[in-house]
Structures are given as structure tokens and as C-alpha cells.
Swiss-Prot record:
<keyword id="KW-0808">Transferase</keyword>
<dbReference type="InterPro" id="IPR003742">
    <property type="entry name" value="RlmH-like"/>
</dbReference>
<dbReference type="InterPro" id="IPR029026">
    <property type="entry name" value="tRNA_m1G_MTases_N"/>
</dbReference>
<keyword id="KW-0963">Cytoplasm</keyword>
<feature type="binding site">
    <location>
        <begin position="113"/>
        <end position="118"/>
    </location>
    <ligand>
        <name>S-adenosyl-L-methionine</name>
    </ligand>
</feature>
<protein>
    <recommendedName>
        <fullName>Ribosomal RNA large subunit methyltransferase H</fullName>
        <ecNumber>2.1.1.177</ecNumber>
    </recommendedName>
</protein>
<feature type="binding site">
    <location>
        <position position="62"/>
    </location>
    <ligand>
        <name>S-adenosyl-L-methionine</name>
    </ligand>
</feature>
<comment type="similarity">
    <text>Belongs to the RNA methyltransferase RlmH family.</text>
</comment>
<feature type="binding site">
    <location>
        <position position="94"/>
    </location>
    <ligand>
        <name>S-adenosyl-L-methionine</name>
    </ligand>
</feature>
<dbReference type="GO" id="GO:0005737">
    <property type="term" value="C:cytoplasm"/>
</dbReference>
<keyword id="KW-0949">S-adenosyl-L-methionine</keyword>
<dbReference type="InterPro" id="IPR029028">
    <property type="entry name" value="Alpha/beta_knot_MTases"/>
</dbReference>
<comment type="function">
    <text>Specifically methylates the pseudouridine at position 1915 (m3Psi1915) in 23S rRNA.</text>
</comment>
<dbReference type="Pfam" id="PF02590">
    <property type="entry name" value="SPOUT_MTase"/>
</dbReference>
<comment type="subunit">
    <text>Homodimer.</text>
</comment>
<keyword id="KW-0698">rRNA processing</keyword>
<dbReference type="GO" id="GO:0070038">
    <property type="term" value="F:rRNA (pseudouridine-N3-)-methyltransferase activity"/>
</dbReference>
């Protein structure tokens, strides 16, 4: 499956850039990965840029109002999407003000990383690590120890 990772901006802090690069590289062992960095001067402009980048791919928005997954359940969800014929999924992290209600309404799924408020850079890193962890679970590899 192809995973399209869309972020408003890119990691600014060294730890987040380094971590993103490492987990993106690891994730590419299991999936085709495309990364799009978008920007906008307003929340509306960011949402439009995310939609444009996602194209026709089902869109999964990282949003505090969304569904929370364990690593195992995320792996199961991604496997089900692949079996359901989705060749690509787009995952999007918005800017500091989040997503517009209009964009939320167009998403296939809202996914919450948890109830904690995370800095933007850390949320990006958690996204790519969570996708990598889910891929290793699906592959039956020992990275995830439950």
C-alpha cells in the first residue's frame, strides 16, 4: 500500500527531523511512501492545500476529536484498508489551529494520537513511528513487543 504523509510545515527541531527521517526510511521497507509538505497563511488555506495534496486518496486526519487506536488495532485497520482495495491512504497533520470543520467532513477517518496535546514536531514523529510500528506488527516482526 502507498502511504501519503501530508504535513503543514516540516519538523523544525533537530530531534524531530532526525526521528522523522529514520522512521520514514524504515517505513519504506513495508510501504511506498510519499511525503508532501504544505503551507497556508490561514487554516482554510492549509485545509485546501491538504485536500489538493491528498487528491483522490482516502484522507485520514490527525485530530484530537478522532478515534484512538492501539498499535495492534492500527495495524488491523491498515490491513483491512489494504484488503478493501485501497491502494493508497493519505494521512494529514494540520497546522497549529488544526483542521477546518469542512475538511473534517471530507475525511474518511479522524485519528487521535491521544488526549495529550503534543507539539507539532512531536506529533509528526509519533505519526511516522506509529505507522512503522503498525507495519512491523502486520509483518510479524519483533519491533513491537506489546
Amino acid at each position: 500500500m502507498r502511504l501519503h504523509l501530508i504535513t503543514v510545515g516540516e519538523p523544525k527541531l533537530a530531534y524531530a527531523r532526525s526521528g522523522w527521517d529514520e522512521y520514514e526510511k524504515r517505513l519504506r521497507r513495508y510501504h511506498k511512501v510519499q511525503v508532501s509538505r504544505v503551507s497556508g497563511k490561514t487554516q482554510q488555506a492549509e485545509s485546501e492545500a491538504i485536500l489538493k495534496a491528498a487528491g483522490k486518496s482516502p484522507l485520514i486526519l490527525l485530530d484530537p476529536r478522532g478515534k484512538q487506536f492501539s498499535s495492534e488495532k492500527l495495524s488491523e485497520y491498515l490491513d483491512a484498508e489494504a484488503l478493501g482495495g485501497h491502494g493508497e491512504l493519505a494521512f494529514a497533520i494540520g497546522g497549529p489551529d488544526g483542521h477546518t470543520d469542512a475538511l473534517r467532513g471530507q475525511a474518511k477517518l479522524l485519528w487521535s494520537l491521544g488526549e495529550l496535546t503534543l507539539p507539532h514536531d512531536l506529533a509528526m514523529l509519533v505519526l511516522v513511528e506509529a505507522l512503522y510500528r503498525a507495519a512491523t506488527i502486520s509483518a510479524g516482526e519483533p519491533y513491537h513487543r506489546g
